[in-house]
C-alpha cells in the first residue's frame, strides 16, 4: 500500500511540493500525494484537518504533511490533525531570525506571488519563448539571452519554456531538420549571435523512440535518419565550438540547470 502525502499551503503549494518531492524521492516507497493550495482561512484549514483525519482512520497510518503555511492560526489547526508534520517555513525562520537579529514579517503568497519586476520579467520571458519557438522567427534573436539549437524532438521547446518560466530567461530555439543535413551550417543571423548559442543533442535510439510515437514508421522517425541528424549536428557543434549537452534520460529541470551552469547565465527570478 502506498503512503499518503499532503502538500498544503496558504499560497500555491509549489514550495511544499518541490521540497517534499525532493525529500521523498530519496526513498524506495510509493507515495500517493494530494496537493491543497490556498488554505487561507481557519474554515478551510478545519476542512483539511478533517480530510487528514479521515485518511488516518481509513489507512491506519498518519499521513505525511509537507506545508508552507504563513499564518500561525492556520498552522496550528494543521498541527492538531493526525499527521506527521513537516513545516518548511518555521524550520528555517526561527534560526534565521536569531542570525539576522530581525523578526520575520509573514506575508502570504510572497514566494510565488506577483512580485513587481520579477513577475513582469517572467511574463516577458515566457512570451518571448513562445514567439521564438522552433525557429518561427529570427527577427528578435538579438533580444535573446540564449538560443537553443538541436534536431527535432531533442528537448528544445520544453527547455526554453522552463528557462523562461522558472528563471525569467529569454530563450529562443532553432531546429535543424533533414533538409539541412547535406550542408549543415549556421544561418547568418545565428553566426552574429554565436555567443548566445547552446546546443542540445540526444542519443539516436532515444530520439527514434520519441519520433516513433509522433510519426510511426516514417523516414523522419527511422533510426537511420536519427543517427544521421545527431551525428551531423554534433559535428557542427564541435566545428563551431558551440557548447552542448546530451538530454537523454535527463529531466527538463536537469537540462536547464546544466545550461545555466555551463553558460553562467544570470537567473532573473529571485
From Swiss-Prot:
<keyword id="KW-0808">Transferase</keyword>
<keyword id="KW-0723">Serine/threonine-protein kinase</keyword>
<keyword id="KW-0418">Kinase</keyword>
<dbReference type="GO" id="GO:0016776">
    <property type="term" value="F:phosphotransferase activity, phosphate group as acceptor"/>
</dbReference>
<keyword id="KW-0547">Nucleotide-binding</keyword>
<dbReference type="InterPro" id="IPR005177">
    <property type="entry name" value="Kinase-pyrophosphorylase"/>
</dbReference>
<comment type="function">
    <text>Bifunctional serine/threonine kinase and phosphorylase involved in the regulation of the phosphoenolpyruvate synthase (PEPS) by catalyzing its phosphorylation/dephosphorylation.</text>
</comment>
<protein>
    <recommendedName>
        <fullName>Putative phosphoenolpyruvate synthase regulatory protein</fullName>
        <ecNumber>2.7.11.33</ecNumber>
        <ecNumber>2.7.4.28</ecNumber>
    </recommendedName>
</protein>
<dbReference type="GO" id="GO:0005524">
    <property type="term" value="F:ATP binding"/>
</dbReference>
<dbReference type="GO" id="GO:0043531">
    <property type="term" value="F:ADP binding"/>
</dbReference>
<dbReference type="GO" id="GO:0004674">
    <property type="term" value="F:protein serine/threonine kinase activity"/>
</dbReference>
<comment type="similarity">
    <text>Belongs to the pyruvate, phosphate/water dikinase regulatory protein family. PSRP subfamily.</text>
</comment>
<dbReference type="Pfam" id="PF03618">
    <property type="entry name" value="Kinase-PPPase"/>
</dbReference>
<feature type="binding site">
    <location>
        <begin position="150"/>
        <end position="157"/>
    </location>
    <ligand>
        <name>ADP</name>
    </ligand>
</feature>
<dbReference type="InterPro" id="IPR026530">
    <property type="entry name" value="PSRP"/>
</dbReference>
Amino acid at each position: 500500500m502506498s503512503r499518503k502525502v499532503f502538500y498544503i499551503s496558504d499560497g500555491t503549494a509549489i514550495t511544499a511540493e518541490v521540497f517534499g518531492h525532493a525529500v521523498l524521492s530519496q526513498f524506495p516507497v510509493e507515495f500517493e500525494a494530494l496537493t491543497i493550495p490556498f488554505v487561507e482561512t481557519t474554515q478551510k484549514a478545519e476542512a483539511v484537518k478533517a480530510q487528514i483525519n479521515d485518511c488516518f482512520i481509513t489507512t491506519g497510518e498518519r499521513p505525511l504533511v509537507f506545508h508552507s503555511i504563513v499564518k500561525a492560526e492556520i498552522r496550528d489547526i494543521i498541527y492538531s490533525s493526525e499527521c506527521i508534520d513537516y513545516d518548511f517555513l518555521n524550520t528555517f525562520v526561527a534560526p534565521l531570525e536569531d542570525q539576522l537579529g530581525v523578526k520575520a514579517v509573514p506575508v502570504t503568497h510572497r514566494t510565488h506571488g506577483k512580485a513587481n519586476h520579477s513577475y513582469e520579467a517572467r511574463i516577458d520571458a515566457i512570451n518571448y519563448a513562445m514567439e521564438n519557438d522552433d525557429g518561427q522567427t529570427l527577427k528578435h534573436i538579438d533580444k535573446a539571452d540564449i538560443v537553443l539549437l538541436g534536431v527535432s524532438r531533442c528537448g528544445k521547446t520544453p527547455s526554453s519554456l522552463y528557462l523562461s518560466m522558472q528563471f525569467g530567461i529569454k530563450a529562443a530555439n532553432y531546429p535543424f531538420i533533414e533538409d539541412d543535413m547535406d550542408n549543415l551550417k549556421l544561418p547568418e543571423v545565428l553566426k552574429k549571435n554565436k555567443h548566445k548559442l547552446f546546443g542540445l543533442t540526444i542519443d539516436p535510439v532515444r530520439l527514434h523512440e520519441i519520433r516513433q510515437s509522433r510519426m510511426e514508421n516514417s523516414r523522419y522517425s527511422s533510426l537511420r535518419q536519427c543517427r544521421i541528424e545527431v551525428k551531423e549536428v554534433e559535428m557542427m557543434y564541435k566545428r563551431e565550438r558551440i557548447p552542448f549537452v546530451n538530454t537523454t534520460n535527463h529531466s527538463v529541470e536537469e537540462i536547464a540547470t546544466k545550461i545555466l551552469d555551463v553558460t553562467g547565465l544570470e537567473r532573473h527570478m529571485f
